[in-house]
UniProtKB/Swiss-Prot annotation:
It is an enzyme of class 4 (lyase). This is Tryptophan synthase alpha chain. The alpha subunit is responsible for the aldol cleavage of indoleglycerol phosphate to indole and glyceraldehyde 3-phosphate. PROSITE patterns: TRP_SYNTHASE_ALPHA. GO terms for cellular component: cytosol. CDD domains: Tryptophan_synthase_alpha. Belongs to the TrpA family. Keywords: Amino-acid biosynthesis, Aromatic amino acid biosynthesis, Lyase, Tryptophan biosynthesis. The active site is at 49 (proton acceptor), 60 (proton acceptor). It comes from Cereibacter sphaeroides (strain KD131 / KCTC 12085). SUPFAM superfamilies: Ribulose-phoshate binding barrel.
Length: 263
């Protein structure tokens, strides 16, 4: 049982949906992003997705791409991201943390070294957007052997022939990308997403979380209501990019979380 598994079990017992929040590590600097991260649980966040900045973020929209650039320009590295997690864990041992990003920084560090450091720091799961199931031996299987969940993305183009392969070694939860394209690109509609979520849930016992295109508490409520929860990223990262005070960012997160929890 991981912290992610425990969180979903608790939420089910409470009759609540999960609210997952994404932030970019080191955006705009280490101090600010750590302050936001530390405030997320009190704002109602059930699971934290922590973005690893990367120089070529092909799946990210302009908001998150720019956040990654700000973080890299501010000196953020994988080492400093792991330091962020350790600092957070010194105060919070309960809230799950999923690192999300691309394979290159992990490969450059060495898979075995990275997994040892990630588990020691207190990471619970990984989302690596550019590693397909055919490459599971590279990272997915070693990560699971190290006790980490490996969370896979399913999309509107993941057909019934492809879905079993996607789900085969997935653990923790399934992240359903509700729209085709890059992050933050459009608004997701529950009426369009519901049949796809039902199709995935028919194929797995894992929780299904909906992400991409959620910007308001109302949308969070609608989309969490047809799944096991929802993820908000670009809408939060945008506030950080605008230089809003940490307290204002967290107030907005709390409103989004309340929407999801009202589902």
């Amino acid at each position: 049982m991981t912290r992610i598994d425990d969180t979903f079990r608790r939420l089910r017992a409470e009759g609540k949906k999960a609210f997952v929040a994404y932030i970019m590590a080191g955006d705009p600097d280490l101090e600010t992003s750590l302050a936001v991260m530390r405030g997320l649980p009190e704002a109602g966040v059930d699971i934290i997705e922590l973005g690893m900045p990367f120089t070529d973020p092909m799946a990210d929209g302009p908001t998150i791409q720019t956040a990654g650039q700000r973080a890299l320009e501010g000196g953020q590295t994988l080492t400093r991201t792991l330091e962020m997690v350790r600092a957070f864990r010194a105060e919070n041992a309960e809230t799950p943390i999923v690192m999300m990003g691309y394979y290159n920084p992990i490969y450059a560090r060495g898979v075995e070294t990275f997994l040892a450091e990630a588990t020691e720091a207190g990471i619970d799961g990984l989302i690596v957007v550019d590693l397909p199931p055919e490459e599971d031996a590279e990272l997915c299987l070693p990560a699971q052997a190290a006790g980490l969940n490996f969370i896979r993305l399913a999309t509107p183009t993941t057909d019934s022939r492809r879905l079993p392969k996607v789900l085969q070694n997935t653990s923790g939860f399934v992240y359903y990308v509700s729209i085709t394209g890059i992050t933050g690109a459009a608004a997701a509609q529950a009426v369009d997403v519901a049949p796809e979520v039902a199709r995935i849930k028919a194929a797995t016992d894992l929780p299904v979380i909906v992400g991409f295109g959620i910007t308001t508490p109302e949308a969070a409520q609608d989309l969490a209501g047809i799944a096991d929860g929802c993820v908000v990223g670009s809408a939060i990262v945008k506030l950080v990019g605008e230089g809003r005070p940490v307290a204002e960012v967290l107030d907005r997160v709390a409103a989004l979380a309340a929407g999801a929890h009202a589902a």
